[in-house]
Amino acid sequence: MNAGHTETVRALRIGVAGCADIALRRMLPAFAASPHTEPTAVASRSSEKARAAAETFGCAAVEGYDALLERRDVDAVYIPLPVALHAPWTERALRAGKHVLAEKPLTARAADTARLLDLARERGLVLAENYLFVHHSAYTAVRDLVDAGAIGDVRALSASFTIPPRSADDIRYRADLDGGALLDIGVYPLRLASLLLGSELRVRGAVLRHDTVRGVDLGGSALLGDPGTGVSAQLVFGMEHAYTAGWRLLGSEGSLTLDRAYSPPAGHRPVLRIERPDGTEERILPAHDQATAAVAAFAEAVRRAGQGAGQDKGRSSGDAAAVLRQAELVDAVRQAAHLVKI
């Protein structure tokens, strides 16, 4: 390369498999706005839905997901389908040679997650799970404060994510689509616990409120602990509650508290409360579009995979380990749970 020459990197061409709300409201706008990605096609079982989305974002409309995977102008596929469809369509996309960004949770079971991660690694492809909040700059601020000893030694986390009931036909109430509060909502505080407390957490107990008519859990709680340090996490989640979306991290010398912790609007400025014996401080953090940040991280992972960086040219071993660990925690909550039938 000649001195002064700047290499042009082609934008990652994205195909979107489905017209879910999060795709239309957050991810397609982020793909379109990012200099790193370009939405090239939107697929739906309904040609009408596909056309409407495609017209909005200036890309091709495709009827059916198989047709999307056959397109040569698609480098990577974003999958916002119901949870039960994540594993089969992720596998098909990987076998078609596409990188995959799948909505959380990647699958409903750890065994399926492990199998897909292995497939991605074998083929040198990126397989990512779309927890947007982990890309928000607020968590960089939190880590910096904890590392600086702002609250002393970390002792415990309490976190909740709860929402009011949805309409009766909402897919969260469909057992055949792997609905339920744990997979749709509880996964957020579980992922948060690993993010803030590390990868050694174990599930020590859980309760799930199980709707026997619809066959899904409507809410629950879980207790996690690190067997080496004794650090613990108390998590509450559900979809029959008043809205909450916050957490408190307790240390030996103070605490940190954050509300609207999982899905803040792009323009929202988070308020991080720092409580110590000498007083309370509220820091107003910068607004940050976590969807745009997630898209940039995915595009960078694909770029690095193309250059041969990371384990076996695919998703780095650390990222894959975090995805698998999350799936194992979800399985462990199910296995440990006392079911309250309602």
UniProtKB/Swiss-Prot annotation:
GO BP annotation list: antibiotic biosynthetic process
Keyword Transport carried by entry: no
Functional pathway: Antibiotic biosynthesis; granaticin biosynthesis
Reaction(s) catalysed by this chain's protein: dTDP-4-dehydro-2,6-dideoxy-alpha-D-glucose + NADP(+) = dTDP-3,4-didehydro-2,6-dideoxy-alpha-D-glucose + NADPH + H(+)
Binding site for NADP(+): 19-25, 44-45, 65, 81, 86, 172, 184
Enzyme class: oxidoreductase
Family that this chain belongs to: Belongs to the Gfo/Idh/MocA family.
Purpose of the protein: Involved in the biosynthesis of the 2,6-deoxysugar, dTDP-L-rhodinose, attached to the benzoisochromane quinone chromophore to produce the aglycone antibiotics granaticin and granaticin B. NADPH is the better reductant, however NADH can also be used.
Name of the protein this chain belongs to: dTDP-3,4-didehydro-2,6-dideoxy-alpha-D-glucose 3-reductase
Organismal lineage: Bacteria, Bacillati, Actinomycetota, Actinomycetes, Kitasatosporales
